[in-house]
Structure formats: structure tokens, C-alpha cells
Amino acid sequence: MSSPLPSERRIFTDPETGARVTQWTSSPALDRPLYFTSPSVTRDDRWLVFLSERDGGSPNFFAIERASGLIHRLTNNTQGSLASYCYPSENRSGIGKSSPCLDPDRNILYYIKGYEFWRVSLDGDRVPQKLATLPAGWWTAFTHVSADGRWLCVPCTHPDAFLPGQSTQWEQLDTVYPLLKDKGLVSRIYLIETATGRSRILAELPFWVTHVNFAPDDSDKLLVNSEGPQSSRHGSPPRIWCVESDGSHHPLFEQNGMRVNHENFARDQPWIIYHGGYEKNGEARRRNFVAARDWTGSPIFEYALEDLPLMHATPMNNPRWSVVDTPEHIAMICPDAQNRSALIPLCRHHSREGFGANQDHHCHPLQTLAGGGVVFASNREGEANVYEVHL
């Protein structure tokens, strides 16, 4: 176990809202929290896990001891970034930047390196252990661990769906699904038993799966997406899908005529939260909303936001509330008794113009499980760093 790095913590007050904000990292390299489908902070509020390229550009994982700010190294990758969703390249080694998921109740981080699944305990000796081997050459994406800690899920997509020479996520979005469709290729949904490392294929789906989520109350229910063009889904599969324990699958609801994104289970309810926009004069980004449905597709709520653009909307501990990033703010959406949405700015994120083009610079705001803050990324200082606005 190596000695920790010194704290980089800085606390300041947002001049617009008066909120207290902690800047947790300040290296000149990329530092960002985990993707919004995984918490970055453990439930006991002791650790904050982040990805950093402070080691000469190769991504590695670190854990901040929140009481002291000390930074503990979790991995020692020197082989760059594995080619995967959001990160196209020709590299078939290194850490998958889209792969980490944190088990927040057992303080274990899971991640992919090369074509292997690894884990490292935040509370133990912090020595990574190999758990399972994945199919060589298949492209991975965001992963998830079940609430009971027994299962990992990882989507793996046939390598022939990925064109050489691409450099951005946006190129992938335009080409991967058409190639899957034209060539009859699939994404496989793998389940890995955390106790043994044994794996099995739960389902083979004829579209590009990049997000997976176990239901919080039932690890036999899996929420997945169909990734594709960033417009309404005419001519392509619906965005949000439900996968049962026998591998059967069905769309959550009919999704034509709207743009839906960033589906996620509520934290302690089997509700599926998502956001999007209805078409308005041919523009799918208009008439925006945040909504929830149950596993059968029945609506629970929908809050209209009119023309307010959202990058992401993630459920808070109150499942009817969401934390969002607008072009200027980290904010909460809190409905009143008549289901009218109220947007409450928490702080300005000051991410620079054009940050949406770089996945690593997306804010990806997520409330901590203990409830006291919202962790997000901001590139206000040039590269992304890890911040938290306190509630």
C-alpha cells in the first residue's frame, strides 16, 4: 500500500447561490467522478472515487478520504485507455474509462482492464484482484453492480460494428447501430458472479447497449438502453428496454416522437427515471421533461420543463426530485403538490463553452447516497476536476 497523496481540497462559496462548494481535485490533468450510472461516494460517506490521467495520460483510479482529503491510489495502469464506448481508439489494452462501477455498500470498485474484470477494496490493502475474463475484441461500455453485491453486468458489442479510425463518441453514435443492423450483429449482456467470477450471457440484443442498471429491489430485473442517434427514434429501436431473468426483453413504452435519454432506476424505488423532449416543429430538444415509469411502463410522473435544455437528470434520494446540469447550473428539479416543476439552482458549474463535445468534461451530477451533496465535474480551470456542491 503506497503512501497517500496530499489533499487538494479547496472550499469556496458560490457567489450566485451562496452554496458551499468543495473542489476535491486540482491536478492539471483530467480528474473526474465516475459516470452517473454509478455512485462515486460510498454510502458511509467515507470515500470518493475518481478517475485521473495524472500519470502521464494513462487513466487510473484514486479514492479520496473525505474526512482528511488525502488521496489514495487504487490502480497502476500504464497502458493507456482501452477502446470502448465513448473512447474509440485502436488500443486493446489499458483501463476502460467507461467501465468503473462502485459497490457503495461494500466499498469495492470494479473496472475493466484489457479484456479482464478487476476489483479493488477501498478498505483493505487496496491491491487489485482479477475477477473474470471477457470475450477478446468485443467492445465494452458502462457496467453495474447489483444492490446485493452478488452480480456484475457488462454489455459487450461485436467488434465488427466499430469502424477503424474513429476518434469521437459522436462518430460512434452515427455508425455502430447501422452496422449492427446491416450485418446482423448483437450486443451481449454478460452477468458475472462476484463471489466466483463465473459469467454467463443473459441476453443477445440486436442493438447497441451501452448503459445497464439492476433494479434496486430485484437483481433479476435489468434496465438497458439502445444507443444511437441523438434525435427522435424514428427508424431505430426505442431507447429504454427491460430485460427479464430469462433474457426476454421489451421496450419500456412506445418512444417514437420523443427524445429520451439517461434512464436510471430510482434509488430505493423500482421506478425508472429518464428525461427527454417531445418534437416541436421538428425539433426534438423542445418541450423538455423529466419523467418516471414503473417496470410495466405505466407513468408515475412527468414534469414539463418547456425549453430548458438538460444535459443529464439523475434521481435524488427523494425519487420525485432530480439533480440536473443545465448549460449554466447544477440544479434540482423539485415539483410542487400540483406536479409543477420548480428549478432550484445549486451553483454555477462554469464548464466552458463546448464542454459537451468531450464526455470527460460532462458534469454528470449525482447526489451522494448520504444525501449531503451533489458531486460533479467541471472544466472551469481547463481540464476537468471533481467538485461537490453541499445541500
Indicate residue ranges for each PLM-predicted region.
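Conserved blade-ending motifs and adjacent loop-strand segments that build the rim/top face
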Residues: 256-260, 300-314, 340-369
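Loop/turn-rich, solvent-exposed surfaces of beta-rich toroidal or solenoidal domains
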Residues: 261-291, 297-342
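Blade/loop signatures of beta-propeller domains
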Residues: 1-22, 181-188
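Hydrophobic beta-strand positions that form the internal "hydrophobic ladder"
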Residues: 48-49, 109, 149-152, 221-223, ...
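Short, conserved, GDST-rich strand-edge loop motifs in beta-rich repeat architectures
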Residues: 3-4, 53-54, 94, 155-184, ...
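Repeated scaffold domains used in trafficking and secretory/extracellular systems
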Residues: 34-38, 83-89, 94-101, 138-144, ...
